[in-house]
A protein has these predicted regions:
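Canonical tetratricopeptide repeat
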Residues: 55, 87-90, 94, 128, ...
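Position-specific recognition of the canonical hydrophobic site in helix A of tetratricopeptide repeat
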Residues: 61, 93, 100, 127, ...
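Structural marker of alpha-solenoid helical repeat scaffolds
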Residues: 45, 79-83, 118, 152, ...
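Alpha-helical protein-protein interaction modules
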Residues: 240, 250-258, 262, 388, ...
Length: 532
């Protein structure tokens, strides 16, 4: 019975873990739990059951747990009978994928070579080895594998794509584009082929073409293929290029609601809340979608623009459609607090905590309400919970330090928190998110703050919010520099009016310069950024 159940679950999970949703699987999933229990029973009964090791390795790979996946596939390969060449080759292929995910490319290449020694015409192994050789810059060797694939199948999209990538990286853009066109023409209605081509276009610095391909993929399947996620990722590298591409395609197809949704999301992710709001308005007015996420996102933008009455109406609509969403209640609390309704804010945040009590943003929201109520001890208690929930998040320490310093008048405790921020590793890919410059400034370590500024500006990708952070850092000891960096933040589209003009719960604030005429002049100059 157990064996039959394992086979049944394994068959389902093979499809599940090789689908586009594989990396979203979690151990909380009932099917995954059942599968893992069966695998454990099978291995307890037979510790050398290579097929079970292989199946569980594939499951761990699907969950993104590469360490456990590697351990299991090592055991599978160890116990696989050498006469079962096809299955053993599959095991080497899986281990190569795991090793590639871990960045161990040379070991992955060794496994792909082993798979091809067992089965010389293994198509997936040829494709994977070609891709890996391309990644390693061994283009001549990669070309051999792709041509081998093409001889086996003259309609192999993988071969055309691989050869196009080789040509792109060896200075043959015209030939690369021709090969890409051949690949797409084999299945012009398949959105995934446009995702693949967009990646190669991006590698060729052809961002308009890359964006157009992703937009077309969205139009084919409303973004289910992952095109939306790729557009959002591309926007972090080439924001203007992605927005220009979306603008161009919206002009061509003004009734494509999903394009407005994507553009609104990207505007919001880059703190241009007024532009994002315009797209959410279009979606609602044109009745493109009636999702609760639309009303949540519109409420979020409205709240950042301090239009609290409208924001409240929208977030309540979202809650009507999804009444157990912790973030929706947290945002309602933020809106009520921003509008001065602390009792209503407290009621909303209590409801948020019912659904997600250890959520950092909810803990911070509770702390801010307590701060506004003058209950600084309670505020610190809430910030303590935020620190416990996410000990590597610097903002929680800064909020707690600020409350210690100005609420409790405990400079010693505040300094301890500022120094704690300096000790954090900073796991975010964006350098500015470590907020160390602000901690240096609060500790009056001016030279170190200036060094952080230089490191941030040299980090390769300075976001509009990074200029805002620098404005906050200098607000306490160099007004001219603070104003200059605020100007740069606004010039680059930083449109969070609430954070610029209202927020006062931590040193990540412009409170020290808000009384200045230069500050008021800047807000007037960029008033369109705030929809004013």
């Amino acid at each position: 019975m157990v064996s039959r159940l394992r086979c049944f679950i394994g068959g389902i999970l093979f499809c599940f873990f090789t689908s586009s949703f594989a990396l979203h699987a979690t151990e909380n999933d009932d099917l995954v739990k059942a599968m893992m229990e069966v695998y454990a029973e099978e291995l307890a009964a037979n510790p050398q059951d290579y097929r079970t090791y292989y199946s569980r390795a594939m499951a761990y790979f699907g969950q993104g747990d590469m360490k456990k996946a590697l351990s299991d596939i090592d055991n599978a390969i160890k116990y696989f009978p050498r006469k079962e060449k096809d299955d053993l080759a599959q095991a080497y292929l899986l281990r190569a994928k795991i090793l590639s995910e871990r960045g161990e490319t040379k070991s992955a290449l060794t496994d792909l070579n082993s798979a091809l020694r067992l089965v010389p015409n293994h198509r997936l192994a040829l494709k994977d080895r070609g891709d890996l050789l391309c990644q390693l810059g061994q283009y001549d060797m990669a070309k051999i594998d792709y041509n081998h694939l093409l001889r086996m199948d003259t309609r192999s999209q993988s071969a055309f794509m691989g050869l196009a990538r080789v040509e792109a990286h060896t200075g043959q853009p015209v030939r690369a584009k021709d090969l890409l066109a051949q690949a797409v023409n084999l299945s012009p209605k398949d959105p995934k082929i446009y995702l693949e081509r967009s990646e190669i276009y991006k590698e060729m610095d052809m961002m308009p073409e890359a964006v157009d391909d992703l937009v077309y993929a969205v139009s084919l399947d409303d973004g289910h293929s992952g095109a939306i996620q790729k557009l959002v990722a591309y926007s972090n590298e080439s924001y203007n290029g992605v927005i220009e591409g979306l603008n161009r395609n919206i002009e061509r197809s003004p009734r494509q609601g999903m394009l407005y949704y994507v553009r609104a999301t990207i505007y919001k992710d880059h703190y241009d809340y007024a532009s994002s709001l315009r797209d959410w308005n279009t979606i609602v007015e044109e009745n493109f979608f009636n999702f609760h996420t639309v009303y949540y996102n519109r409420a979020f933008c409205l709240s950042r623009l301090t239009r609290f009455d409208e924001a409240r109406a929208d977030i309540k609509r979202a809650i009507e459609k999804d009444s157990q969403n912790a973030e929706y209640y947290r945002l309602l609390s933020e809106i009520e607090r921003g509008d001065g309704n602390l009792a209503a804010a407290e009621q909303a945040v209590r409801q948020a905590a019912v659904y997600d009590p250890s959520n950092v943003a909810i803990c911070l929201e509770r702390g801010m309400i307590a701060y506004d109520e003058g209950d600084f001890g309670q505020a610190i208690s809430c910030y303590n919970e935020a620190v416990i929930a996410a000990p590597d998040e610097p903002y929680s320490y800064l909020a707690r330090a600020y409350t210690q310093e100005y609420g409790m008048e405990n400079r010693i405790a505040a300094e301890a928190d500022y120094r704690k921020v300096l000790s954090l590793d900073g796991t975010s890919a964006a350098y500015g998110n470590n907020l160390k410059g602000i901690a240096f400034a609060r500790l009056h370590l001016k030279k170190q703050a200036e060094e952080w500024e230089r490191s941030l500006l040299a980090s390769g990708s300075v976001r509009n919010i990074d200029y805002f952070y620098l404005a906050c850092m200098y607000a306490g000891f160099d007004v001219d520099k603070s104003i200059s960096y605020l100007d740069k933040a606004l010039q680059n589209g930083y449109g969070d009016y609430y954070r610029i003009h209202v927020d006062c719960y931590s040193p990540v604030s412009l409170l020290p310069i808000r009384h200045l005429s230069q500050y008021s002049d800047l807000l007037y100059k960029y008033r369109a950024l705030f929809g004013k």
